[in-house]
């Protein structure tokens, strides 16, 4: 099946499965093409491509799998190609005529519209206007169809009007994200939940429904790459979906510091204060970077009090507990803990696999269970590294024209990471790490004590040694003070059972795996 045959049918399928507004805004205006044998969907700009990949790529690829399974997955990129008409009835393909955006060899085809639209530059919104304001203003300037006489048959909206409405909606959407600094990719729909983030995700959804009420401030902490930014931006995107007129802003603490310093230099302090006080939801990532900056901390203290008194929502992220931020104003440390403070944990195996499967679905690529398990076992530390590994494998899949990611493809794409991970890990390294983690002596791990606080870490160390080294059971026994191999086997089985029954031990085990391998 050619692209000219496929795309009209795909449009029909998408038209039938999507809400009318979504189809008109995002799918109907698309153009397509073929580059080097690869089918390409062109978006108006990078923002549109990001939205397509995060929200619609899975549906487009599902249709391709059904109607043109032999073709490789679509690539999404900014540009213009050929626009095809939607098939009137499924199975009846319209003639493959290039439409408004088709480009012939050497000369562009001129757009022919039923109604002439005045050409004008896109309206750039004032900083104080909301997306709803922008949309309302621009909708007033759209060309309107003549009013139909009573009882007469209504005729379809003209191409010009439909296109203009779609462009206005999309431009307003882009303006919203420019104002808020939120990524359209970070939503609750694209968030994968697991043990490490389930409670935080539930709290975030509650905040999006009722900001400024129960959990204010919402303080989220954890190591880098665990998904803090995704989760807090999802709150902003969800709030705007429910309340388009809400004033939301996401920023890194460095941006807050720079804007404050600029206000001091330019003597625009009052403007600075009013700018931040206007927001209904303010999200600041990595708040720890304001530590040691006395004037910035003082100003943020007053801003915090304003948000709290006005019941406006404040969301903050950090790499450690508020109480452990060295150099932070004690008053701020205290206020950070007034609301809800939660930690994000490294993703467990099941969550890592689910993340890979979700990424594959969004990219329109199939991934075999064995390959997902392999990648999830290889990358244990954080979500960011896991997504980076998937992007490499996904790129290899497209370049090699292999629509299914299997374990061989994953191994080939990640061979340098595999080589790094396979550095020599010895029983001594594991014993030392476990002793430090549980705050016991190495001599206790190797000794004869059988108290629970010693025996359990010893069994964990044995199990880790079995997983991370090539030592046999007798050799592991020798490394642990000359123990019998049956003792080692018993310890490994005990830990395997406890990892299923005891969430705390399972979490300890995962943390130790990450510490030892990194």
Swiss-Prot record:
Domain II, as annotated region: 72-180
Family note: Belongs to the DnaA family.
InterPro entries: AAA+_ATPase, Chromosome_initiator_DnaA, Chromosome_initiator_DnaA-like, Chromosome_initiator_DnaA_CS, DnaA_C, DnaA_dom, DnaA_N_dom, DnaA_N_sf
Protein name: Chromosomal replication initiator protein DnaA
SUPFAM superfamilies in alphabetical order: P-loop containing nucleoside triphosphate hydrolases, TrpR-like
Main location: cytoplasm
Residues engaged in binding ATP: 225, 227-229
Chain positions covered by the region annotation Domain I, interacts with DnaA modulators: 1-72
NCBIfam families, per the entry: DnaA
GO molecular function, one term: ATP binding
Functional description taken from the UniProt entry: Plays an essential role in the initiation and regulation of chromosomal replication. ATP-DnaA binds to the origin of replication (oriC) to initiate formation of the DNA replication initiation complex once per cell cycle. Binds the DnaA box (a 9 base pair repeat at the origin) and separates the double-stranded (ds)DNA. Forms a right-handed helical filament on oriC DNA; dsDNA binds to the exterior of the filament while single-stranded (ss)DNA is stabiized in the filament's interior.
Subunit structure: Oligomerizes as a right-handed, spiral filament on DNA at oriC.
Localization annotation: Cytoplasm
Region (Domain IV, binds dsDNA): 398-518
GO biological process: DNA replication; DNA replication initiation; regulation of DNA replication
Keyword Secreted: no
Lineage top rank: taxon: Bacteria
Gene: dnaA
Stretches the record annotates as Domain III, AAA+ region: 181-397
PANTHER family in alphabetical order: CHROMOSOMAL REPLICATION INITIATOR PROTEIN DNAA
Written domain comment of the UniProt record: Domain I is involved in oligomerization and binding regulators, domain II is flexibile and of varying length in different bacteria, domain III forms the AAA+ region, while domain IV binds dsDNA.
Region annotation Disordered: where it falls in the sequence: 145-172
Keywords: ATP-binding, Cytoplasm, DNA replication, DNA-binding, Lipid-binding, Nucleotide-binding
């Amino acid at each position: 099946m050619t692209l000219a045959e496929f795309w009209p049918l795909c449009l029909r399928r998408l038209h039938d499965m999507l809400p009318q507004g979504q189809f008109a805004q995002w799918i109907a205006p698309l153009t397509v093409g073929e580059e080097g044998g690869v089918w390409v969907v062109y978006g108006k700009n990078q923002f549109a491509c990001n939205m397509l990949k995060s929200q619609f790529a899975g549906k487009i690829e599902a249709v391709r799998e059904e109607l043109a399974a032999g073709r490789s997955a679509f690539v999404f990129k900014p540009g213009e190609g050929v626009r095809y008409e939607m098939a009137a009835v499924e199975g009846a393909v319209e003639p493959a005529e290039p439409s408004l955006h088709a480009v012939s060899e050497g000369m562009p085809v001129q757009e022919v519209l039923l109604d002439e639209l005045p050409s004008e530059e896109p309206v750039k919104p004032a900083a104080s206007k909301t997306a709803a304001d922008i949309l309302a203003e621009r909708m007033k300037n759209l060309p309107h169809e003549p009013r139909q006489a009573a009882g007469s048959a209504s005729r379809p909206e003209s191409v010009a009007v439909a296109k203009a409405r779609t462009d206005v909606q999309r431009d307003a959407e882009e303006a919203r994200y420019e104002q808020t600094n939120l990524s359209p990719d970070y939503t609750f729909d694209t968030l994968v939940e697991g043990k490490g983030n389930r409670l935080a995700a539930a709290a975030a959804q509650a905040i999006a429904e009722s900001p400024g009420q129960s959990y204010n401030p919402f303080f989220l902490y954890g190591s880098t790459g665990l998904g803090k930014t995704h989760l807090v931006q999802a709150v902003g995107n969800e709030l705007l979906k429910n309340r388009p007129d809400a004033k939301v802003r996401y920023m890194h603490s460095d941006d807050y510091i720079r804007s404050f310093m600029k206000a001091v230099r330019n003597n625009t302090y009052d403007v600075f204060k009013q700018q931040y006080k206007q927001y209904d939801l303010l999200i600041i990532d990595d708040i720890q970077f304001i530590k040691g900056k006395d004037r910035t901390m003082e100003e943020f203290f007053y801003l915090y009090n304003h948000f709290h008194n006005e019941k406006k929502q404040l969301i903050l992220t950090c790499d450690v507990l508020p109480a452990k931020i060295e150099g932070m104003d004690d008053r701020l440390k205290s206020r950070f803990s007034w609301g809800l403070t939660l930690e994000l944990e490294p993703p467990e195996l099941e969550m890592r696999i689910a993340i890979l499967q979700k990424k594959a679905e969004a990219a329109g690529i199939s991934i075999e269970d064995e390959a997902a398990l392999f990648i999830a076992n290889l990358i244990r530390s954080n979500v960011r590294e896991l997504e980076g590994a998937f992007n490499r494998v996904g790129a290899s899949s497209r370049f090699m024209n292999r629509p299914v990611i299997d374990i061989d493809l994953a191994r080939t794409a990640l061979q340098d990471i595999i080589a790094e991970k396979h550095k020599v890990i010895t029983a001594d390294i594991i014993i030392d790490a476990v002793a430090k983690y549980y705050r016991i002596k190495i001599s206790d791990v190797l000794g004869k004590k059988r108290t629970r606080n010693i025996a359990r870490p010893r069994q964990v160390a044995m199990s880790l040694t079995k997983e991370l080294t090539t030592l046999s059971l007798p050799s592991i026994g020798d490394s642990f003070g000359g123990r019998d191999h049956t003792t080692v086997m018993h310890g490994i089985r005990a830990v395997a059972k406890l990892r299923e029954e005891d969430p705390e031990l399972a979490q300890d085990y995962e943390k130790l795996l990450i510490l030892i391998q990194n």
